[in-house]
Amino acid sequence: MGKLKKKGERGAATNYVSRNQALKKLQLSLPDFRRLCILKGIYPVEPKNKKKVNKGSTANKTYYYVKDIQWLAHEPVLNKFREFKVFLRKLKKAIAKEQPGTADRLEDNKPVYTLDHIVKERYPTFIDALRDLDDALSMLFLFSIMPQTDKIQAAVVQDCRRLSVEFQHYIISSRSLRKVFFSIKGIYFQAEIQGQTITWITPYQFCQDPPTDVDFRVMLTFVDFYKTMMGFINFKLYNNLNMHYPPVLADKTDKKLDTNYCKDTEVEDEVLAALNHTLKIIQTQEEDLEVDEFPIDPNSEDAEAIQAQKEEETKLERLKNLFSECKVFLSREVPRETLVFMIRSFGGQVSWDVSTAIGATFAETDESITHQIVDRPSQGHQFLSRYYIQPQWVADSINQGKLLPVEEYFPGEELPPHLSPFVKEEEGDYVPPERKAIMDQEMDTNQNEVTEEEEVPDMTREEKELAVAAMPRKDRRLYEKIMHSKKKKRSEVRKLESKRKVHDEEKAKKKLKSS
């Protein structure tokens, strides 16, 4: 007769381990354990039956998979954490004994770990890294404008700033930007890189006051990993475009004016951060390959799909060169870096006043300027050869894929609603009048391309009632729930439409009074 197994020695209980047990096994402190889990991508799990895992107890505990903890035990970074612990103990002892020579020697030999192998381990292919790029970009752009504090070092801010500027230069060079949206939280951007849609948010350029209730140690661990990951991604992206990495300016001409605003050693970095100069491309002897075009057989099965793909490519090429014929000047009060990034990503030329920032390419007095972006109701001196518009015109033009009329965006005018390009209305949802107008225009342009389909006759009320009565009880309950949710959605839509109607009436009354 075999030995009886005790409770908790088999089944689900052996698949999980509590956090305290994991700390004892790895011989780590809680902050080091958290840092290691973040770097390796290990997250807590919720067992299906806590009683079985916790030997009948229902106390709240954090659990991990046993396999994950065993995997962490073989991580090379774990040894570096232990070496760093020994280093701190020796350094503290040398300082207490007033041995500056020993302390300096220990500082020079401080243990440092690299995360290259972890990045390659978590992202076996480049596409895997691109799919996980959204959070990395949002975090790096956030820390790129953070002030230096006792928790945030200046070197971290500089690295985040450098990596974010390099990524923006790639987007400009490859014309990969697709959508922009100004929100209360920040500015949302969406780009398409190698078939992957990447969305990130950048904060507005204001002075940031870091909150005290945020654990910056956890956030800085994420930043540490994202910096290494972003370095690999930027190198690969630049290599695909045959550009130097780190980026090098294509035209290193006279910059005497630039040295008036920064040190000589910082000029090139500041000009790169201005996003207004092209980067140097590695010259290759390979000739540009031209894609052969073959006539489309109208009788083939894929004729419609091929034609639709061609039209989509033409539309995308037109979007990439949206501002190619625009020469834009930015006033002091507008968000310069954001607008430069947006306009140059679609082929436009941008500049600003020389005293505002480094990197200006032409002056305000240039007669070839087509648009000047302002954000104040009145201007001291106006040129008749250009349009004065508000910044929202740039974002709305990008989202609609065409240069919009400028009359609604003149200084002092009440701007049209800034609609989010990320919202996709489903059947029965509330659609604002402005969105309806855009959708109607798109339907008019595509009217000739839509093929006529056979109309399916609607069921009468009696036929619907008979069909519902013939349903099984389970299907009928599901049908009633669906109809109830649709009815609730319709009532909410009616409320929003009535609110919008009242708003439009009040707006019309104000216009009449002002006139």
UniProtKB/Swiss-Prot annotation:
BRCT domain boundaries: 318-411
Report the record's Gene Ontology biological process terms: maturation of 5.8S rRNA from tricistronic rRNA transcript (SSU-rRNA, 5.8S rRNA, LSU-rRNA); maturation of LSU-rRNA from tricistronic rRNA transcript (SSU-rRNA, 5.8S rRNA, LSU-rRNA)
Function recorded in the entry: Required for maturation of ribosomal RNAs and formation of the large ribosomal subunit.
User: Which parts of this chain are annotated as the region Disordered?
Assistant: 477-515
**Assigned GO CC terms:** nucleoplasm; PeBoW complex; preribosome, large subunit precursor
The family note in this entry says:
Belongs to the pescadillo family.
Q: Which residues form a coiled coil?
A: 270-327
Give the taxonomic lineage as stored in the record.
Answer: Eukaryota, Metazoa, Cnidaria, Anthozoa, Hexacorallia
InterPro entries cross-referenced by the UniProt entry: BRCT_dom, BRCT_dom_sf, PES
Pfam families for the chain: BRCT_2, Pescadillo_N
| Record-given protein name | Pescadillo homolog
Keywords linked to the UniProt accession: Coiled coil, Nucleus, Ribosome biogenesis, rRNA processing
A single Gene Ontology MF term assigned here is: RNA binding
Domain of life of the organism encoding this protein: Eukaryota
What main location does UniProt list?
nucleus
